[in-house]
Amino acid sequence: MELNELTEKIIGCAYEVSNVLGSGFPENVYEKALQHQALKTGLIAERQYQMKVFFDDILVGEFFADLLIGQTVLVEVKAVRALDELHVAQAMNYLKASGMPICLLINFGRPKIEIRRFVPYDVWKEQPHFAHHRIR
């Protein structure tokens, strides 16, 4: 499946979760619901996907992305009143460390969900139509 098509399917799943659950639940509720909806639509979706961070070929840390969908799209789920620069930095760092081609930051904490896409610069150069935020 093409990357843009995959992200649109994931976004559709997020809207379905938002339409059914609304806002006000903790993040893990939305994370589980989004995984369920993605699986229901035939996508591969792993929760709490573990990744490692290396510096000079030395393991310096580990982190868990909320979801990895389609084996290529990281999804970071939030349930906050407003996304801030720390949420954006987290999504960008996860994307850089993972080497994945895209990260979706999805906030279910408002009546209308907020979705931001992040892509590495090299992917953005090839497909600029699909980046909201590019990272170098």
Where are these regions (language model features)?
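Residues at secondary-structure transition points
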Residues: 1, 5, 25, 29, ...
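Nucleic-acid nuclease catalytic cores
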Residues: 78-125
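Glycine-rich, flexible loop/turn motifs
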Residues: 17, 21, 25, 56-59, ...
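Glycine/small-residue-rich phosphate/adenosyl-binding loop
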Residues: 31-66
